[in-house]
Amino acid sequence: MKSYRIYLLFLLLAAFSLYGCKKTDSGSGDFDVQFAVPESVTISGDAGTFKFRVLFGKSPLSTDKVIFGDPSGQLNTCDIVSVSSSEFTVSLYKGMVSGQYNVYIRRGNLKKLVGKMKVTIDHSGGSTDIIVNPEAGSTVYGVVVCNGKRISNAVVSDGVEVVKTDENGIYQLKSGKKHKYVFISVPSGYEVMSEGILPKLHRQLVKAPAVPERVDFALQEAPGQDNHTMLVFGDIHLARRTGDQRQFRDFTNDVNDYVTANSGKKIYGITLGDMTWDLYWYSNSYALDDYLKDANAINGLQIFHTIGNHDHDMMYAGDFETVTKYKKIIAPTYYSFNIGKVHYVVLDDIECKNTGKGDADSRYYNESLVQEQIDWLSKDLAFVPKTSTVVVTMHAPLFKDNGNLSAGNGSSLVDMLKQYSQAHVFTGHTHKVYNVDKLASDNIFEHNAGAICATWWWTSYLTPGIHIGQDGAPGGYTIVNVDGDKFKWQFKATGKPVDFQFRTYDRNTMSFTAAKYVPDASDAYKNQFLLYASDYVTTSTSNEVYMNVWNYDPSWKIEVTENGNPLKVTPMRANDPLHLVSYTAKRLNKNAKPSFATRDTRHFFKVKASSPSTTLNIKVTDRFGNIYKEDMARPKEFSTDIYK
């Protein structure tokens, strides 16, 4: 269910008078006004107004009225105080209470029901009674409160400057308002209000750079954060194509099931970027707003967001203007927050070099942390004790899977993070799963955490029941359990139990011929298939078994026995055969380029058995002692059906 939590403290300064309530018994009728009525909203008890989103450009007239039919049956008529093509604002009536409301629009004697809305009135505290004056040179200022209590030492930033609230909960920023927003680094033990899945930790700035403006932040208490779970969501790539929205519902259902099963624990979520696909913002009319509609199927979960390269607007040249929509709709492109004993930092390591032509060929970017962001991070971390644990999320990887630095300016990030007791870096972008453990040398562990969409939603679209990435890892997410400063994590495949951690293949039963897998392809595409499938084109009598252990790191242990005798486990690089036949072959068979073709991976292993028909006992133990097993009866058939 959608849940909008709205804190409109700054609107209270506007001179909007509240319209009186009266019994309304108008006739019913129809006229062309359309707007979205959220299923559920939370409104501050101090809020004097509420905004509705206009649909299809069908705005009301300023003389129309909005009527709230309250739980007692009373019809309460409210003025419309401002209207645009995208939204309109109404004055809320005095004495509004929590409950289920029918929402009507009225024009003259015509009235029509638009929707039903559950309203929760939040009286957790406000700050409009606190007098705050800007200091000399301050252009953004305000107070941070919770339940009427002023919160000191809360960190606030405009993306350039970083300050803390004083003993009275007041902050003062000498801001140039470059990013046109201000955000709070949510302090430990607190949360901000939510609007659906979005934690509303930033506010838009509306006045000229030199004109002081007040922005307050209201927090709510969140006890028990020291023991919390963070669900980490890699690339999503919703674009209204390849059945992605239907498949995405499988993911949202999976997350809802997990949250329900662990209802006694503090759980949050965070994305790793590429929630959308910029090319299809325009060609398929699916953009950031549409993503939020689909993602709001997730219940009771605040989801922080990281920006990816495909969340930039390619219709603009350069970098700065490409993120304007993202900053207004989703979140700042970089910011921080605290949960329990962990300081979380969200970074943007995509530096766009767009030409602004608006086509795929004009889309250029560097995977790099620009210096301005490094400077901001240095200021942010100055308030974080070196004994703390820091978690960083960004879209493109910090390290390659061989451990070498990948991100531009990555050495600056490493130099800052290694000063802390430990740092975990979660990244996406590759649609692969791999880990880089540098805890011993630099106090850093990077998790390149795969993709919700796996192969951009293609494998399940072409081969229903198979949802895997180019490295054979399933589409899914990472469950990070935090107990104080102790971290444990597991990869969770969508729709699978959490103990599904590897897949096995019997090499003896695989023979990937062009005649079998790409019979309709041209000779050129058949030859391409044979290149991708070169390890599997001939029947083998080697008695080898391959294992794809996607979340493997060097602290894992893989043991295989045959008739009680241990077999030598050998690392290898290989193309995942299931991905070959469920995606690459099916594209080639249609004489189409496999844009997301199978890629070899480092998380493959093999053993050599003594016989083609013995059962192998496979035991995989992760770094935390969790054990995953398969008793592999052989010969094991290779077909997509057995892996569904």
Predicted regions: what they are:
Residues 61-63, 137-160:
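Short, ordered, surface-exposed loop/turn motifs in non-cytosolic proteins
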Residues 188-211, 280-384, 408-424, 435-483, ...:
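Extended active-site neighborhood of metal-dependent phosphoesterases/phosphodiesterases
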Residues 131-139, 146-147, 189-282, 644:
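N-terminal active-site segment of His-dependent metallophosphoesterases
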